[in-house]
Amino acid sequence: MDLGIDGRVALVLGASRGLGRAVAEALGREGVRVALAARSVDELEAAAAGIGGETAVVGVDTGDAEAVAALPERVAAALGPVEILVLNTGGPPGGAALEADLEAWTEAYRSLVLAPVILAERCVPGMRERGWGRIVSISSTSIREPIPNLTLSNANRAATAGFLATLAREVAADGVTVNTIATGRFATERLASLHGSIEAAEEQARADVPAARLGRPEEYGDLVAFVCSERAAYLTGTAIPLDGGLTRSS
């Protein structure tokens, strides 16, 4: 199936590893020119080497508002204006509802909420002018069903999902789609760190995920590539569960 995005320019956050890297690779296979962004330039360069098409590497700390604001211009200078924006921020640390201090709350807010808002402000006007754009947020099932001991993630990701759903309805008539992926359990370093090992995560998935397994990063990348495609032009303003049937609420 031709997804119709050959030659488009994408900015993928958190692209050095895990689901962000899988998304960057999937877009690259479709001929998208991909700017990979994360803190570690060395890891980004290794990830970029695995993508066959044209790429750019941009180091950024998503907790630094000024650096985030400058990111689209850096991408434009290297590849062209951002047409596909993939929002993805790892963490934050786990903890019960009243455990996190103000500093932890502020740091999580800057990365998980403020960074997406800033990038939308910088990228959406150009998308609307060109009559085409895609924004996809790599989020969590916690936006529907809070996950125990992940308070910072639960609260901040839900806020971002609300912002993006609002934005989607404001830009839908301009050819810009905005969607969130409510991500379940995938075989990543992040999940391994939460469970102690990937083997422990797999065992838990067999017990309580209806699909009886963890998701594979390449499955994730393929779905996001489709959501970014011409084929999905009528899909906007929604949160798509990708969780092997784990989420019970509709």
Q: What are the roles of these predicted feature ranges?
A:
Residues 1, 145, 225, 236-250:
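Short C-terminal tail/terminal secondary-structure segment
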Residues 16-17:
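Conserved glycine-rich cofactor-binding loop
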Residues 96-109, 201, 205:
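Substrate-binding pocket helix/loop in short-chain dehydrogenase/reductase
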Residues 120-121, 165:
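A short, exposed helix-loop element centered on a Lys and neighboring polar residues
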Residues 125, 169-170, 233:
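Alpha-helical segment proximal to the catalytic Tyr-Lys
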Residues 172, 177, 235-237:
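Short, small/polar-rich loop/turn modules that mediate ligand/substrate recognition or access, typified
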